[in-house]
């Protein structure tokens, strides 16, 4: 049983030769520790040493002709409360007029190549879709929460644009990737203090 078959069996509720294993998505500070332990800076070799069954292959596919980011939050700092482009927005028209990402700028060539050469591992993929994080970055966390009450229509409009882009991006990606992927990797949480 190879890595891919193992996780497919586990997810289907069928017997497998052992428990599945995924190292996860280590923090950048962890990789030097692992590299030192295993004596290599080749992350794939490290994953093989762990006998890791899965490779999370994310589409890094947005190529704006002017090299703009997929979502241009225009944040004023790194902290969660740092205001973004909509920190002071009170108009749905302003939200709609924003330069939202265009799915026509997606190019899945490199992602498809990575999926094709991933080997016998289980391959979850797709756009991760951290909607709440992205929307919070557009406002700043505190502004986001306040505007949910004071300007709910503005928050809904930003959320709609973010979600609609991800839906279309994933629709296009799944149409191209087909059975090269085993599962959709969806990650999102809305944790507060």
Task: Identify the role of each PLM range.
Residues 1-193:
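Catalytic cores of TIM-barrel enzymes
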